[in-house]
Swiss-Prot record:
Cellular component, GO, one term: nucleus
Keywords: Coiled coil, DNA damage, DNA replication, DNA-binding, Metal-binding, Nucleus, Zinc, Zinc-finger
Region annotation Zinc finger-like 2: where it falls in the sequence: 741-760
Protein name: Protein MCM10 homolog
Lineage: Eukaryota, Metazoa, Chordata, Craniata, Vertebrata
Annotated source species: Danio rerio (Zebrafish)
Coiled coil start-end: 70-108
Length: 833
């Protein structure tokens, strides 16, 4: 059954090859030989991956022989084909015999892997396309030659070019070395037509992608960075060898100035917009492309596609870089100055690749929508209308990028508000009138502030007021429960009530005394205190002498024994007055002392007669023994005589120490410093030390990536800021809206209030604003070709064109600051004439 299927498959393949051979001469006769077009050999119509380019070259070399033999195959007769079929049948029988023999010897575990690999190789995308068998004109019918042919035929996984239909694509492939086939089922799978489902090939390894930060080369002729290039730089140079390049932004001027009909010229552009295909009166469809070269974003060109050009190219995506060969200019519409071009053949348009720098502005409009202005992402990410605002926004973030700015407002770290907040706390008086410090705020109303403690306490009626008013009705249970809890509010109320009670009592004991009476009272109190102090000291001395072993109270009182009493209480202590002072509970000098205790402030040194208990006990013991202590003379010179034994021991120790030092010095002389240094160098140069020195962590690459990422995050904003500066420096003029008042005869960016109020004859129109600068540094923006007046700073009329951003000048060197003639005075010396 398998042999019949194989024969049917071979017959169908031969029939298809005959049909293709019959169609190929007609196709070759119908081809046009266009010498002045880009793609004579149909290059560049299909995108080819870099890996597939080499494989395609090998495939083309292998397909040369089948292409040459196509003319000879047409002359074959049916008898020759039948003979070839018989030959193929014999070969298939031999192959089947070899498969049966190899199936017995092959281990079972190798079958799934080989079968999986062969099935994957047959499910490539090219399998779904029309296939043709290899030519079978070899005299050698060995299986090795057939497997070699099958192996050499399968090389690529991409789809064949649509235009080159005469190319033949093999049906089978094998990634291993030529060897006998192992399974009959595998032969059937190779001879059967594969399914049409496109699956990616698994034999080829994935293409290594470029890193993100790797620079992409700029194409020579278009000046743009390309993504997925269709042609190599060498092919583009060959096509541009005898042709002249004209920039798209310069094309309107060149067409108006020069005659380009006789020359062979090319322009490159990017498709920035595609208008929906439209129909003409005769029913034919055409399309319009908007083109720009991304170097001058103000110059756009329209390309009209008619007939076959529209049929072949209308699916081209936006952002594609194309080259146009000798386009024909068209007449402009009435009131339109935009240049329009057209081409008469599809091969006059060369698709190069995709523009990597094609994009739109990333800023937002005032209404919140995204900006749709065209930008070159390599130069700047913002259009000329938003770049200045973004530059100011990025410049305001300098503190966040290059300092330790925390984001908190200054002056609020210690509870201080801003100057406005501090001024707005109260009114101010000026000129005899009172006014608010600040105007009322237009912001949302602030929440109501909580009442302060003073206001809450003032609202609580005191006990005295309630008693006087006769409104005491008792305390409620809820209030009593709240007051019993140790909350801050309850404690504050209790403290307030206690202070009011004490202040009332203290106020009733105040008496008026004259100055002389007050001095007399103070003098009497002082004398009483001194007398009480002396009596107290005498009593203490008597107690000490009577109780010999008992501890003696010091003449200076111990402050830590209790709270102190007032001087008045101390003076009344010896008199035996037991009544306590009645007065306000205010801090006193003797706080903490009990009633009747004394405080002695006698700072005089103690008398020599008074001895401590320990000294008295020692004196009594000496008297009992009968010994007497002789008093030493303090003026006598004391000298302690050393013991002879100590001296001899010290001498022996010094001798032993000297011997040890001599031995050490001798050993040091034997090993000089050079020898030690040599040993150290030998250790440093040893393998062990070098291995320790060169040892690194296995995760050191992670630190490198982190540092690189940190550097990129730091420098990326600076690079973007520099790009914005360069873009603003390059902008010399901008389109804008202006107003012209015919009554007042002026043109400005907005109308004056007087013109609006009096309803003058003014109208809005499109204008161009230009930037100028004076040698003195003054800048001016003007809507005319040149400013009408002189410089307001220096009085000169020497205006020069300048960019949107003022040029930043660095520090000047000494030669620039040197003025040999001194400071110039043009108004007096006329030095500028």
């Amino acid at each position: 059954m398998t042999e019949e299927e194989n024969l049917d498959m071979l017959l169908s393949l031969f029939a298809e090859s005959e049909g293709q051979d019959l169609e190929s001469p007609a196709a070759e006769e119908g081809e046009d030989n266009l010498d002045d077009l880009f793609d004579e050999d149909d290059d560049g119509e299909q995108y080819i991956e870099p890996e597939e380019a080499e494989e395609e070259k090998e495939e083309e070399e292998e397909e040369v022989s089948p292409g040459k033999s196509s003319s000879s195959d047409l002359n074959k007769s049916k008898e020759d084909l039948e003979a070839e079929l018989k030959l193929m049948q014999e070969k298939m029988q031999k192959l089947q015999q070899q498969l049966e023999a190899s199936q017995k010897t092959t281990p079972a575990q190798n079958k799934p892997a080989v079968q999986r690999q062969s099935t994957k190789s047959l499910t490539s995308p090219q399998a779904g396309v029309k296939t043709t068998p290899p030519t079978v004109r070899d005299s050698d019918g060995s299986p090795s030659n057939i497997t070699a042919k099958l192996k050499n035929k399968q090389r690529t996984a991409h789809q064949p070019k649509a235009a080159s239909s005469e190319r033949q694509i093999p049906i089978g492939q094998s990634t291993n070395q030529p060897q006998p086939m192992r399974d009959g089922a595998k032969v059937n799978s190779m001879l059967k037509s594969p399914p049409l489902i496109k699956t990616p090939p698994t034999v080829r390894q994935p293409t290594p992608r470029l890193p993100v930060n790797q620079e992409v080369a700029v194409e020579k002729f278009s000046g743009l960075r390309l993504r997925k290039p269709r042609l190599s730089s060498i092919d583009i140079e060959q096509k541009m060898a005898s042709r002249k390049l004209i920039r798209l932004s310069q094309l309107p001027d060149r067409l108006a100035r020069d005659n380009l009909e006789d020359s062979d010229w090319v322009t490159f552009a990017v498709i920035i917009n595609k208008i929906t295909p439209q129909s003409k009166n005769n029913g034919k469809t055409f399309s319009i492309w908007k083109l720009n070269d991304l170097h001058n974003l103000e110059v756009n060109v329209s390309l009209f596609l008619f007939g076959s050009v529209h049929t072949d190219l209308w699916k081209t995506d936006t952002g594609t870089v194309i080259g146009i060969l000798n386009p024909n200019p068209m007449k402009n519409k009435e009131g339109s100055n935009e240049l329009s071009l057209t081409v008469d053949h599809p091969q006059k348009v060369l698709i190069i690749g995709e523009a990597m720098d094609f994009g739109t502005c990333k800023a937002k409009k005032k209404n919140g929508d995204s900006c749709t202005q065209l930008v070159n992402l390599y130069e700047c990410q913002f259009c000329q209308y938003h770049v200045k605002a973004q530059y100011k926004k990025m410049s305001s973030k300098r503190a966040e990028l290059q300092s330790s700015f925390t984001g908190s407002a200054p002056g609020k770290g210690r509870g201080r508000g801003s100057l406005k907040e501090r001024l707005c706390q109260s009114d101010f008086h000026y000129g005899g009138m009172s006014s608010l410090a600040c105007a009322p705020s237009m912001s949302a109303p602030q929440p109501k502030k909580q009442p302060t403690i003073q206001s809450a306490l003032a609202s609580i009626p005191t006990k005295k007021l309630v008693l006087n008013s006769g409104q005491v009705s008792g305390c409620s249970d809820d209030f009593r429960g709240l007051m019993s809890m140790p909350t801050p509010g309850a404690l504050n109320i209790k403290r307030h009530l206690g202070q009011s009670k004490s202040s009332a009592v203290a106020g009733s004991s105040v008496q008026s005394v004259s100055a002389s009476d007050l001095l007399k009272q103070q003098k009497e109190q002082h004398q009483q205190r001194m007398m009480a102090r002396k009596k107290r000291a005498e009593e203490i001395q008597k107690r000490v002498l009577q109780s010999g072993g008992a501890p003696v109270a010091s003449s200076r009182p111990n402050v830590s024994r209790g709270p102190l009493l007032s001087p008045k209480a101390a003076s009344e202590g010896p008199k035996g007055s037991g009544s306590s002072l009645s007065g306000p509970a205010v801090p006193t000098l003797g706080r903490g002392f009990s009633e009747g205790e004394d405080i002695v402030f006698d700072m005089s040194p103690p008398s020599s007669k008074s001895l401590s208990a320990t000294k008295l006990a020692a004196v009594r013991k000496l008297q009992a023994k009968g010994s007497v202590i002789v008093k030493e003379d303090p003026n006598a010179v004391k000298r302690k005589r050393a013991n002879s034994g100590d001296i001899t021991g010290r001498v022996e120790r010094n001798i032993v120490k000297a011997k040890v030092t001599d031995e050490n010095s001798a050993s040091e002389e034997e090993e000089p410093a050079m020898k030690k240094r040599r040993e150290q160098l030998e250790y440093i140069q040893s393998e062990e030390f070098q291995r320790i020195l060169n040892a690194k962590s296995s995760n050191s690459w992670m630190m490198g990536e982190i540092e690189e990422r940190a550097m990129q995050e730091y420098f990326e904003p600076l690079v973007q800021k520099e790009k914005m500066e360069e873009k603003m420096k390059s902008i010399r003029e901008m389109k804008c809206r202006a107003v012209t008042c015919k009554t007042c005869k002026y043109t400005h960016f907005k109308p004056a209030d007087r013109c609006v109020e009096e309803k003058h004859d003014y109208h809005w129109h499109d204008a161009v604003k230009r930037f100028f600068k004076c040698p003195c540094g003054q800048r001016k923006i003007c809507l005319a070709r040149m400013p009408h007046g002189a410089c307001s700073h220096c009085g000169l009329f020497k205006w020069e064109r300048d960019g949107m951003l003022k040029e930043k000048k660095g520090p000047k060197i000494g030669g620039e600051l040197l003025m040999p003639r001194g400071e110039e005075q043009p108004k007096f010396l006329n030095s500028l004439k």
